[in-house]
Structures are given as structure tokens and as C-alpha cells.
From Swiss-Prot:
It catalyses: (R)-pantoate + beta-alanine + ATP = (R)-pantothenate + AMP + diphosphate + H(+). HAMAP family: PanC (MF_00158). Catalyzes the condensation of pantoate with beta-alanine in an ATP-dependent reaction via a pantoyl-adenylate intermediate. InterPro entries: Pantoate_ligase (IPR003721), Pantoate_ligase_C (IPR042176), Rossmann-like_a/b/a_fold (IPR014729). ATP binds at residues 31-38, 148-151, 177, 185-188. Homodimer. NCBIfam families: panC. Its EC number is 6.3.2.1. Pathway: Cofactor biosynthesis; (R)-pantothenate biosynthesis; (R)-pantothenate from (R)-pantoate and beta-alanine: step 1/1. The reaction proceeds by a bi uni uni bi ping pong mechanism. The gene is panC. This is Pantothenate synthetase.
Amino acid sequence: MTKVITTINEMQSIVKQHQREGKTIGFVPTMGALHDGHLTMMKQSVSENDLTVISIFVNPLQFGPNEDFDAYPRQLDDDVAAVKKLQVDYVFHPSVDEMYPEELGIHLKVGHLAQVLEGAQRPGHFEGVVTVVNKLFNIVQPDYAYFGKKDAQQLAIVEKMVKDFNLPVHVIGIDIVREKDGLAKSSRNIYLTSEERKEAKHLYQSLRLAKNLYEAGERDSNEIIGQIAAYLNKNISGHIDDLGIYSYPNLIQQSKIHGRIFISLAVKFSKARLIDNIIIGDDYID
């Protein structure tokens, strides 16, 4: 039976009890408004661990002053009903005051990995992410933590944090879950108008175009980016907010493609900014 926990003390007490019993703990951090991408991660955690904890916490530290913190969808009852069907053991749902009872005196700073892509567009965003993930890791103390590859930059940063701080957590990246037409599942898709939703399938189609160019031998980043942009400008009303090709997971911008690379795309529609990506290269598996 799924139980909702709202305090840090109770969550830590539960974790300690299960650790004493030698149980493995899987953890899926979320901000709620759960979709199939989240549920896929939870299913994997349930199948691989004795105990699964998810968090539902809309973290104010990762929202900028002009972003959608107050408008971010909150649907706790629906989310809890969904995870109960998956036999998730605990939902950790703290308040903002519970997580941040006073102003932080210690701040984590992310280097180069937060200065490109989403980090360049959203200053301070990834500092907020690593702060809350670090706190959640300390509270839940998972053996395995599951993150979606749709937020590939976030995944790279969390993996780097775990490595740099010797955290005893195995980070598992889960493949992007998509709608039938290819649109990546996202809590922000609900902001799309009906016409924008029809157009949004072209984000993934543009990335497939890039993959086809790569497989045909194209290695010039500018050529691939140019063709992606031309395709999108022809097929969507949204604005291309960011488009680039980077090494992965080091996120160094590439002019000539070699090794494993990450093509990142962000498109801003009227009320939604959608991101998508594709990873290709020497060890790429579709």
C-alpha cells in the first residue's frame, strides 16, 4: 500500500528501518503532474528494488523570476492514484517550508555543465536542481535513482555531482518516453494549443532528420543544425529557443562531430517551452 510522507524526519526514519532490514531502495524524484515517462521510471524501480520511493516536490529554487513556478501543474490526488497502481511504497511530498525552513547558508555551484544549453537560458536553474537532488538523496538515501534522458543535461549534471561528491547512489538514465507521433512526454505539454500540439511532433522529426544525416556521413555541425532549423521553421509556429550539438556527457560544443554527441533542441510555443534531444555517435543505440 502506497503511503504519503510529508516530513523529513518520518521519511528518514522509514529509510533507516528498511536499511536495517537490508532492503535496496529505488528513488524517482519528480515535481508531480506525472506522465508515462515518470511511470516508466517507477515501474523499473519497482522491478529492480525491494522498496521504491518517489518524491513529488515543486522546487522553487530551479525556477527563475519569470518562469512558471506558481502555474506549474499540481495534481497530488491524481498522481498518488497513479503510483498506487504501480505498487510504489512511499510518496515523499514535503512542503517548501519543510525542505527549506530557512535561507540556505551553503550553496552548491555547478561549473561548465550549467553554463550551456538550458543553463545559459535559465541562470541558476541547475544550482537549484543539484541543491534539491542532493537534499533528497540525503533524505531518502537510495541505492538507485532514476532520471529521464529527456532532461539529458540534468542527467549529466546529477551524474557528475554523484561522482564528484562520492555519493553512494547509482544513477540510472531512462530512455525518453514518447507519444505515438514522437512528441516527448512532458508535464508542460498540457500548455500547448490544439494546433501547437499538432506541430509539436516535428521536434522529434527534426532530430530524426539529424540522425539520418549523421548516418549518411554528415559530420559538419553547422550543416546539420541548419537543416534542423530549416525543417522546423517550415513546420512549426513556435520559436527555436536553443539548438546545438555537444559532446556527451561533457557538453562541449562541437563544430565537427566525433565520438558520442548530443543534439539538443528547445522550442518556445505561446505558453510552453519544450525540450527534446537525441544522442548519437560511436555507441549510439536507437
